[in-house]
């Protein structure tokens, strides 16, 4: 199953949440718009994918987002391809983006109570405002394009493979870890609850 959600929200941050968001010192008001894709395939041979980008306006404005891949069974070729596509999205804009955003992804998508990463990583960025809105927006769009290229290639390579009941059980366990992360650690989930 694949879910794609486009949301635009506005309002006022609560007193207890305001100090966690940049640019709210003078005003608690915000506007945010984003697109999010979460793909959990029926086949345990096909990884789960997550992608989101957003633009947020408070007293300041910025882009954020990223993409990551969570396979049930690690396939190094898939991991290499996914990271190659993320690097292709980043490189034209700044040579430092990919290593910096990959590191942030590795740190962010981590289950500290289990001492394990959620998946094989990707990129994660926030508070992006270089002063050139058009270039920043072009980067965000390229992250989406390259994510789609990676997903399409990987899904097409594995979608027809057969699997066993034991492999399906492994996939369900991995999905449980995914849910744990979202409920315990995900800033986007918290933002949605708080707004």
What are these regions (language model features)?
Residues 1-65:
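Internal mixed beta-strand/loop scaffold within catalytic domains of large alpha/beta enzymes
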Residues 1-22, 128, 133-184:
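Gly/Pro-rich turn-and-neighbor structural signature
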Residues 2, 31-34, 61-70, 116-134, ...:
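Glycine-rich, often proline-containing surface loops adjacent to acidic residues and nearby aromatics
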Residues 15-17, 46-48, 75-78, 190-193:
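Short helix/loop capping segments that flank catalytic or ligand/cofactor-binding pockets
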Residues 41-43, 57-59, 69-76, 127-139, ...:
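A generic structural motif
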Residues 59-103:
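Compact, glycine/acidic-enriched structural inserts
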Residues 87-136:
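Hydrophobic, aromatic-enriched interface-forming segments
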Residues 179-195:
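A translation/RNA-centric and nucleic-acid-associated enzymatic feature enriched
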């Amino acid at each position: 199953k694949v879910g794609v959600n486009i949301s635009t929200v506005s309002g006022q941050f609560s007193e207890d949440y305001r100090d966690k968001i940049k640019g709210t010192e003078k005003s608690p008001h915000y506007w945010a718009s984003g697109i999010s894709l979460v793909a959990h395939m029926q086949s345990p041979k096909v990884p789960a994918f997550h992608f989101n980008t957003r633009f947020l306006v408070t007293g300041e404005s910025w882009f954020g987002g990223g993409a990551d891949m969570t396979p049930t069974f690690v396939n190094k070729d898939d991991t290499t391809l996914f990271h190659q596509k993320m690097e292709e999205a980043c490189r034209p804009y700044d040579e430092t983006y990919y290593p910096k955003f990959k590191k942030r992804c590795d740190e962010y998508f981590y289950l500290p109570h289990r001492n394990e990463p959620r998946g094989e990583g990707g990129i994660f960025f926030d508070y992006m405002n270089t002063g050139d809105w058009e270039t920043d927006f072009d980067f965000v769009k390229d992250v989406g394009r390259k994510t789609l290229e990676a997903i399409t290639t990987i899904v097409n390579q594995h979608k027809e493979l057969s699997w066993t009941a034991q492999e399906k059980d492994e996939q369900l366990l991995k999905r449980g870890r995914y849910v744990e992360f979202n409920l315990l650690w995900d800033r986007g989930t918290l933002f949605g609850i708080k707004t």
